[in-house]
């Protein structure tokens, strides 16, 4: 009961710490997150539809890039029973709830390593409050933050499982076959808890963080295996190691499978995205046909020279848009120059001068954490160090990216799935766990007097000399950091650059002094604690209990770590970043141009918004079905289309607009925007406060074509768009032989008719055949058509093979939608869609009148839901059974002890 009270108190402390960092959430305010604003923009169409049609939710949106699956946007999937637990853990005001989850996970991880509770609290604070977490919260990378928050939970499950399996009450060489009751129940429980934690971590939906987590897990498992192999007296535990490994693998797979409702659709979608690579062969040497372009993936590589940021937050200036006081050199200069809005200007200065394009801030791990980590490298021996060192080194090498290209290319070309990821500097999040874990593990052992006094002093002064000595050196000679000049300074006058450089040097010196003081305080506390006489510090249960000065030291370290990370974190997430929900919705207030466009009653057309960053802005998608948008997982064929045609056509449009006097004059000259018109780009926004440019040449929702041009390769297929009249002729790739055969047969009939009559048959433009869009929903399109013969229709809709289905219904009829699936009438016929004009949908329509129904119903969703449901039910039952097994084993053990004492 006493322990329950202690843990409840620690939980309450974590709640206080989380909410004290973001007290604004208690007033109902939210973080003004740019990425969340973008998410609401890209998700608005799907969310609106799903709210109005809960029985027929959409997995497709036309709001950006012509249309794409919502797999990476909407996470409202059915089937997973563990999702309720996941959402319960997120109870509370965000982002405080994210910090609370990270604190609890860090605490559990430290306990799994055998640390005392007070040191575990310090380690939890060090893990949860790293400055990078605050930066990603501020910009809105919520899924990344959730994935990082569950990182220590998963690792704690792994460590607990192996420790339970290998903590036997028998000596080496004894028969261990009959002692399974002492370790197997807890091992199964540990593996089950690991599976739950892994399930939650994957639910956060950030595969790159999960990938880094897998590296750490493998490092730990391999480290334990090597330890058992090289120690003869421990080899008898290899059996338990393999059993624990098998349990983690099997039960962990079940945990992963609870997310099948999300993973399977994502697995199906990824090969078609930018992360699946381009089919084109004419790209640069850095192109990876099975993943992202190498230059694109490594654009954000952490500089080798900026690694001291881990110890000194402003070593490279901090953030790309940072704040300086008015009495700084830059402030004085701008004040003398009469800079308007000086106070506002001083809040957004280019202070970062490192090699990355720009950054929200440094990967500051905490001066105290770095000192303790270095101390651990020197003092700690054996298995608890080397797996952490290995994981940390791999993470650092990966984060260096383009600055350590041979290693990066090795992983990019040969490591499974690694080529799907970008922003490689993110790998340093591994250090947010490994560094505190080793550092505070060693501090715990120091306070438990596990080290020789002389060895501790020697190691302590070496670690102090390395860390505090470097800080002192930066204070006295800041020039060792570099020139304090950034490549982004090139457009500024020399006098401003000189002022900025002076201020950057000042920032470095101040933070170097700050880190020096913090390290000195902790080292002094350690020396003070170690000077005390050895006392009896063993509890009733045989565990070590901190007493006397050690308690004071541990508590002081908790406070110092909190102060260190709290104060730096506030630089990147503070009250200025919080706004009311009402103010947040102002992002989506319709502009004048939006209101004009909304007057169009056509249910399906596209808008090209040039008043924003067209292909890096998703807020435009809140109001319109856009040709642009923002998504790191857009369809690769669409990205190819942007690069080959849409971007050049936009450039051509600007050229026309520059020479025009009126909007009407611009509209007259839009005939060259072939691909934009093919995508039914009906409106072009230039000025948000004026009427849009109307593209009268847009092809519309659908049209008939009479002929085709075959393309043998993807390169030929995309190139033919330039030379083909897409209104009358379709470009068809060789991967659609049935469509090519239809066109070939139709062309033969045309030639035969020409030979028999001596004149051409009636063209499409003069034909009475018609096709009209009659109903629009993001996941369903209905068309009414009438033809005198079989005809090929092309639709200004994006082709995607994994889910779009089509039926021909008799004229005036429609089946029913049941459980999100279309049930056709008995007279309906399902037909195949084909890809035309690089990425549009095409269909062969029968002779006569009828209704064409297109619906997005990917089979992967139903399969995923079934697997998720079965896996989550099994996992919940296994948790109950394993917990009951541990309780029964503990009860039997107590009865056995009572019997032996009688």
Feature roles, as predicted:
Residues 6-44, 250-264, 394-397, 471-472, ...:
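Transmembrane signal-anchor helices characteristic of membrane glycosylation enzymes that use polyprenol
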Residues 14-103, 109, 125-137, 141-149, ...:
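Membrane-interface coil-to-helix junctions
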Residues 44, 50, 54-76, 80, ...:
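Extracytoplasmic/lumenal acceptor-recognition loop(s) of multi-pass membrane glycoenzymes
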Residues 97-114, 369-372, 438, 523-524:
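Transmembrane-helix motifs of polytopic, lipid-linked glycan transferases
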Residues 110-129, 178-189:
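Transmembrane-helix signature of polytopic, membrane-embedded enzymes
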Residues 139-150, 161-165, 187-199, 207-252, ...:
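Contiguous transmembrane helix-bundle modules in multi-pass membrane proteins
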Residues 241-302:
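Polar, glycine-rich mid-to-C-terminal structural blocks
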Residues 371, 397, 670, 682, ...:
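Active-site-proximal, structured, solvent-exposed surfaces of multi-pass membrane proteins
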């Amino acid at each position: 009961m006493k322990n329950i009270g202690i843990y409840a108190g620690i939980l309450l402390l974590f709640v206080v710490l989380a909410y004290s960092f973001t007290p604004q959430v208690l007033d109902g305010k939210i973080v003004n997150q740019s990425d969340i604003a973008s998410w609401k923009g890209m998700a608005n169409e799907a969310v609106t539809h799903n709210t109005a049609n809960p029985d027929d939710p959409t997995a497709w949106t036309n709001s950006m890039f012509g249309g794409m699956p919502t797999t990476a946007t909407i996470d409202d999937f059915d089937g997973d029973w563990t999702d309720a637990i996941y959402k319960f853990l997120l109870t509370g005001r965000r982002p405080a709830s994210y910090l609370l989850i990270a604190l609890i996970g860090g605490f559990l991880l430290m306990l799994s390593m055998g640390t005392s509770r007070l040191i575990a609290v310090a380690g939890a604070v060090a893990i949860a409050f790293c400055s990078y977490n605050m930066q990603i919260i501020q910009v809105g990378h919520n899924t990344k933050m959730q994935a990082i928050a569950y990182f220590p939970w998963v690792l704690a499950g792994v460590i607990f499982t192996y420790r339970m399996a290998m903590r036997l009450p028998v000596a080496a060489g004894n028969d261990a076959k009959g002692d399974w009751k002492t370790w197997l129940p807890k091992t199964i429980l540990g593996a089950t808890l690991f599976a739950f934690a892994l399930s939650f971590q994957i639910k956060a939906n950030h595969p790159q963080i999960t990938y880094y987590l897998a590296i750490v897990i493998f490092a730990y498992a391999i480290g334990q295996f090597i330890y058992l192999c090289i120690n003869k007296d421990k080899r008898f535990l290899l059996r338990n190691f393999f059993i624990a490994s098998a349990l983690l693998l099997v039960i962990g797979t079940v945990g992963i499978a609870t997310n099948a409702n999300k993973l399977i659709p994502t697995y199906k979608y990824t090969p078609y995205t930018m992360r699946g690579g381009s089919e084109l062969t004419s790209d640069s040497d850095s192109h990876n046909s099975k993943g992202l372009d190498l230059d694109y993936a490594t654009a954000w590589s952490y500089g080798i020279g900026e690694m001291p940021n881990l110890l000194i937050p402003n070593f490279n200036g901090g953030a790309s848009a940072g704040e300086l006081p008015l009495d700084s050199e830059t402030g004085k200069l701008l004040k003398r120059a009469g800079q308007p809005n000086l106070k506002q200007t001083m809040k957004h200065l280019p202070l970062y001068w490192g090699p990355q394009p720009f950054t929200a801030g440094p990967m500051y791990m905490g001066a105290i954490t770095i000192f303790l980590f270095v101390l651990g490298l020197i003092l700690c021996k054996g298995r608890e160090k080397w797996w952490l060192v290995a994981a940390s080194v791999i993470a650092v090498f990966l984060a260096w990216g383009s600055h350590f290209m041979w290693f990066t290319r090795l992983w990019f070309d040969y490591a499974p799935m690694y080529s799907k990821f970008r922003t490689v500097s993110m790998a340093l999040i591994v250090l947010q766990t490994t560094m505190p874990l080793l550092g505070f593990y060693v501090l715990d052992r120091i306070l438990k007097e596990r080290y020789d006094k002389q060895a501790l002093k020697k190691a302590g002064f070496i670690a102090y000399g390395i860390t505090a000595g470097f800080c002192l050196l930066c204070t006295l000679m800041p020039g060792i950091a570099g020139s304090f000049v950034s490549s982004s300074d090139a457009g500024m006058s020399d006098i401003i650059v000189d002022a900025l450089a002076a201020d950057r040097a000042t920032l470095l010196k101040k933070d170097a002094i700050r880190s020096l003081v913090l390290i000195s305080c902790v080292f002094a506390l350690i020396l003070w604690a170690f000077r005390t006489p050895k006392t009896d510090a063993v509890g009733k249960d045989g565990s070590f209990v901190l007493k006397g000065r050690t308690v004071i030291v541990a508590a002081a370290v908790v406070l110092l770590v909190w102060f260190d990370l709290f104060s730096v974190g506030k630089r990147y997430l503070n009250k200025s970043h919080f706004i009311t929900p009402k103010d947040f919705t102002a992002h989506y207030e319709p502009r004048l141009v939006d209101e004009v466009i909304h007057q169009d009653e056509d249910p399906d057309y596209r808008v090209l918004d040039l008043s924003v960053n067209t292909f890096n802005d998703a807020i435009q998608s809140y109001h319109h079905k856009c040709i642009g948008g923002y998504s790191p997982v857009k369809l690769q064929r669409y990205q190819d289309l942007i690069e080959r045609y849409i971007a050049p056509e936009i450039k051509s449009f600007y050229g026309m607009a520059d020479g025009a006097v009126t909007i009407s004059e611009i509209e007259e000259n839009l005939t060259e925007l072939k691909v934009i018109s093919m995508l039914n780009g009906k409106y072009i926004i230039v000025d948000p406060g004026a009427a849009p440019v109307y593209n009268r040449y847009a092809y519309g929702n659908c049209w008939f074509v009479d002929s085709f041009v075959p393309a043998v390769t993807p390169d030929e297929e995309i190139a033919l768009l330039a030379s083909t009249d897409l209104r009358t002729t379709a470009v068809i790739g060789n991967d659609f032989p049935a469509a090519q055969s239809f066109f070939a047969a139709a062309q033969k009939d045309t030639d035969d008719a020409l030979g028999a009559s001596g004149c051409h048959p009636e063209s499409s433009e003069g034909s009475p055949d018609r096709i009209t869009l009659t109903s629009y929903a993001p996941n369903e399109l209905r068309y009414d058509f009438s033809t005198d013969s079989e005809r090929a229709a092309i639709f200004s809709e994006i082709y995607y093979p994994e889910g779009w289905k089509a039926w021909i219904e008799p004229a005036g009829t429609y089946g029913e939608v049941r459980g999100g699936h279309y049930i056709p009438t008995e007279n309906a016929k399902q037909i195949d869609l084909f890809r035309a004009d690089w990425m549009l949908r095409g269909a062969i329509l029968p002779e006569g009148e009828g209704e064409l129904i297109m619906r997005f119903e990917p089979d992967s969703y139903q399969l995923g839901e079934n697997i998720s449901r079965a896996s989550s039910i099994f996992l919940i039952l296994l948790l109950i059974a394993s917990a009951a097994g541990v309780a029964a084993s503990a009860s039997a053990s107590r009865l056995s002890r009572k019997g032996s004492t009688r």
